[in-house]
Each structure stands twice: as C-alpha cells, then as structure tokens.
Amino acid sequence: LISDGTLVASNVEALGSGDVTDNATLEMNTGGDFANNIGGTGSVVKSGDKTLTLSGANSYTGGTTISGGTLVANNVEALGTGDVTNNATLELNTGGTFDNAISGSGQVVKSGDETLTLSGNNTYRGATTISGGTLIATHVNALGTGAIDNRASLLLDASGQFTVTDLTTESGGNTEIGAGSTLQATTLTQKSDSTLTINLDSNTADPVIHAASQVSLAGTLDITGVGDVLDSDPASTDDLDTFTLIASDKTIAGDFEKLTVAGMDADLADFITVDGRIDDTGKQYELTTALTWYADRDDAVTDAHGTFNLTNADGSFAVNTVLENVDATLDPASATGWDGTSLIKQGAGTLILNAENTYTGGTTISGGTLVATNVEALGSGDVTDDATLELNTGGTFDNAISGSGQVVKSGDKMLTLSGANSYSGGTLISDGTLVASNVESLGTGDVTNNATLELNTGGTFDNAIGGSGNVVKSGADTLTLSGSNSYTGGTTISGGTLVASNVEALGTGDVTNNAVLELNTGGDFDNAISGSGQVEKSGDGTLTLSGSNTYTGGTTINDGTLIATSVEALGTGDVTDNATLALNTGGDFINNIGGTGRVEKSGDETLTLSGSNTYTGGTLISGGTLVATNVEALGTGDVTDNAVLELNTGGDFINNIGGTGRVEKSGDDTLTLSGTNSYTGGTTISGGTLVATNVDALGTGDVTNNATLELNTGGDFDNAISGSGQVVKSGDETLTLSGSNTYTGGTLISGGTLVATNVEALGTGDVTDNATLALNTGG
C-alpha cells in the first residue's frame, strides 16, 4: 500500500508478489517483467533507461509517466485508466482497445501480432512505430503528431483528417486509410513491397493524402469503394471522373508497382476501366475512369480490349478522345486476344465516336448503333456493319462497308461515300446530302431518302429508292436508275445523263433536268419535267409523256415510240425524231421537229403543227384532225392520212398524201398540192385557193369546193366536184373534167384547154372562157 509520497522499486521483485494499492506514486526504476496487479488512485512512474513490462490487470487511476527507458504494456489494462505522459518509449505489445490519452515527447511502439486500437485524443509528439500486428487509430489524434514508421499494419479509421509529420510504410508493411478518413503529412514514403490501402465512400474528400514536402511511391496500391467517388454510368469520355488520392506540393518520386481496385458498380460498362496514375503535373496521384482501350498502356486493372458493349437500348456513350493503335503496349499474356487496332460495337445501345481516330484494324458493328461524327471517326480500316452505322458528318468517307446492317446519314452536312460497299441492310438518309461516287457506294439494299441523295457516278444503280427526299444526278457520267422507285421529292439532273429504265425509276416527283434525261422504257411517264436539259427516248418500247412539261433543251427520239398526250409534253425545245413521235392530243404544237423518224397524229382532237419541221420519216394521221400551218409543218416525207389533214397555209406542199382520210384546205392563202397523192377520203376547200399541179394531187375522192380550186395541169380529172366555190383551169395543158360535178361557183378557163366530157362536168355556174373550152359530150 502506498498512501503518500513516492515508493521507488529498483527491481521487479522489490514489491514481492502481491497486489499493489497505489494511492500516491509508484516509481519503477528497473527493467524486467512486473506482473503484480496495481490498483488505487495513484500514479505510476517509469524511470531509468531499462525496459520494463507491465503484465498485470491494473486498475490504478492516477495516470502513468514514462521518464526514461521503455515501458511495455502487454495488455490494454496494464497502464490502468489514467492518462499516459510519455517522454521516453511506450511499447504496446497487446491487442484490444487502448483508450488512455497519451501525451509527452516520447515515442509509441506497437509490437506483437495482435490488433490494437488507439481511440484516445492523443497529443504525444514522438514517433509511432508499428513493428508487429495491426494498429488501428479510431480518433484523428490517436497517433499524436510525430512521424509514423509502419513495419506491419496500420489502419486510420476515423472520420476526419489525421495530421502527422512523416508516414513511412516499410517493405512488407500495409497502411490503410479508412472510409471517410484523410491524412495530412509532411512526407509520405511507400517502400518497395509495401502496400497502401485506401477505402473510399461517398463522404471521402479528395485528396485523401496530402504531403507538404515529399511523396515517394513504390509497392502496391489497393483501393476499395471506388464506385462511391467515380461515376459508374458516364455519358461520354468527358464525364470520366478523376479523384485525387495523393497530392504533393513537390514532384512525386517513384510510382506504385501494382494497382488493385474494388467496389466499382457492377453495371460499369466493360469498355471503361479504373486506373490510378500520377497526373501530368507530377504532383498528384489520381484515381480515374478511362477507356479499357488504353488499359495495358496505362497499367490499368483490366486487360485492354477494343469492344464497346452497351446493353441498354436507350443508353449511349460518346468517345471524345482519340482511339489510336495500342498493339505495341498490349500485355502478351492478356486473355482478351485483342490486336490493339480494331473496334467492336456490341449491345443494343448507341456508341458515338467524336474524335478523329487513327486506329487501322477495322470496325465491326454487331449490335445497336455506332455514330461517327466525322469521316475519320472509324479510323482507316474496313467497316463490317451488322447493325446500324450512323454517319452524322460531312466530308468523304472512303472506308469500305460490308455486312447485313443499315447505314444512316444524319445531320445537315454533305457526306460522300466513295468506297466499294457491299452492305445489304439498306440506307436511310434522314438529313443533309448523301453523295454516292460509285454505284456500289450504297451497298445492295433499299434506300430510304428523306433528304437529298446525290448520285455523282456512272453505271447502273438498281437499289430501290423510297422516301420523301430529292435525288440529284451530278457529274459527267451516264447513270442508269433501274429500280422500281417510289421517292416523292423529285429529281434534279445537273450533269451527265440520267437513264430511267422504267417509268417508276424517277419516283413520283417533278424532274428538273439541266443536262440529259434518257427514258429507255415503255409505259406512262407522268412526272413533270422542267429545266434547260434534253430528254431522250431510247429503247423499242412505247413511252407516253403525260406531264405538263417546260424543259427547254429539246427532245430526241432514238428508238421506239414516244407519245405526247399534251402539246406541253415535250417542253419548248426542238424535237429530233429518229423513230416515232405520236401526238395523241389537241392544241398547237409549236416545237420544231427534225430527224429521220415518223410523226403520228392519234386521238380524236384537233392538233396544229406550226413549226418549221424537217423530219423525213413521214406523217401518219390515225385520228382526229392534223392542221399544218405551213408547208414545212409535216416535214418532207409522205403523209398517210386516215382521218383529217387540214392545210391552213399557202405555198407548195410537195409531200405525197395517201390513206383513207380527207384533206381540208383552209385559210385565205393559195396552196399548191404537187404530190402524187392517193388519199381516198376526199378534199374540202373552205378558204383561199387550192392549186392541183397534177390530176392525182387531190387523190381519188370527191372534192367539196367552197372557195377556189385551181387545176394547173393536164390529163383526166375524174373526181366529183361539189360546193359553192369556183374552179379555175390554168396552165397551157389540156385538162379533161369527166366527173358528174355540182359545184355552183362557176368555171374560169385562164389558159390551155378545158375539156368537158359530160354536160355536168362544169357544174351549174357560169363559165368564163379566156382560153379554150372543149365540150366533148352530147346533151
């Protein structure tokens, strides 16, 4: 019993083997193992330079002072319940929770293989050494303010900032920062084969560790709770997080040799990896999410691969960083087998590539949508598209595209596809202009064009084209559209020749033709045609133009039959007819017609030809009335008149006229028929003068003469003549009238001889004979 003053024990046996009740001061100036239990209200002082071990279950309350040597506590009760003033060395060789407050200038050593928790608000200034077991600090001041030398295991596990001078983790040691804890140190040293473990949660602030003077890194970094500080569902590479683990005021020396990461959301896309690295300033060690594409190069925790698997059909991810070849940095032991140069898009979601990428190994789209926002986005390799490739860009895209998938052109720019493509899933143009520079550019599938499709190429384009958009033919080549097309936005021909091999080839919209439109087909083409270009009809089919057309470049008929159902059908330019032009319409057709072909007038309407025509293939009138307003109107060929030919003109009409139809002379001009004509339908003279220069000029039918018929010929004219008009015999030849004529307008003989072989031959009117009248008849 110590009731007053100080009792000094100079050896561990000095107090015998019984319990000690210390109500004053017990000074232990000795070394060894003191196993006596100490109770009471007094204090214990360790003096001298020896090492003393207290192993009793002590309950004294007056505190402990270590003024010299080493005091070893081999259980957490060994120092009673009072504060500890440590000005030498306190060694805690025990497990459990030690909550006595420790102050003083001395050092604390944790020894043994047990786990010890320091929970006190400690102020000691000496170093802390962990030589064995695990030391857990559950108060931010538990380790005092001195340097820490960790040779075993240290856990800082309190919400808030631990402040120490130096923290060194020796080889084989592990320093762990608990979730919510941070550390402020003068220096941080992680030696080779050491481990730094950082546990993160949503309350963890960065940086987790700040060192004001120096950071030296080696060994292993283990990180948990990553998902609490990094976004596991980023929308783009711009959203990939950076969280600072270690910050230094000076350049960090060394680096961790190994990194392990745990606690990331299981839904984190496998194309994103978590990586730890020293930043470009060299002063921060950061935890980042990055593309797995670069994992091996950056020593990330996963093996690098080039697969982007977006499983959510409504989800998307935008890559704004450049994807380049990384084959030289790949781990040869990687299980992925990736070549480091190719990209694979999987899953139902959308991957957006925004950078000008340089990878060379090709792109495979096996699911969802891959969006390229520039023409370099898919690198330089071929594209295998088995889902959807969306090109939201302008420029020239020359990568070859194959596969069963679709290509979509979006955005308002002009994009040219120049590759020899074989994809079969079709093409959708939703905006802007898509230019095909060869007929294979759009693969083999149908095209849905809701904007502008420009075909700057020659050859045969047999893809079916639908949609509400416009098709443009540009360039100097000849392009054939052979598909059964339904697009409604119209067609523009700005260069070369566009050949339509069926009447649906140009869809249902208007055609603006500023070059050459060739229609190599039969059927009814009712699209309206405008522009300065030429229309050509080729092929042996019969084609009908039924639109109200305004094109000015002329029409060429090379083969077959071209039917015009209106006088506007052939625009306003000249017609070169080298086959058959059928005019099944009425009205005034003023276009000039040339060529070696034939003109046919069909239908029951009245059509006027007023052009100065030179066609040589003849004219067929199968229905209605064909009016010629000049003697060149029917070209130079024969006329087969099976309906009505009206000649409303003057001059010399030398074309031969045959057929079963009628010829009408109208107008007040003088017209001469000089052909050897065989038409049988009769002749009507309603105005002016009709001159016949041979007895066959008026065919074989009756003549209804209500104006003037001039017969300037010789021979036997046996056509019956009726009407109110006059008959004039001119010329010096002898003409015989042998018909039974009833005309009433009289007869004028101005030259030659007129022979009447019957008393009706000269009709009923007066005869003015200024030459010779021979009456070779009786009656």
Regions found by a protein language model. Give the residues of each.
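Residue-level signature of catalytic and energy-coupling elements of molecular machines
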Residues: 151
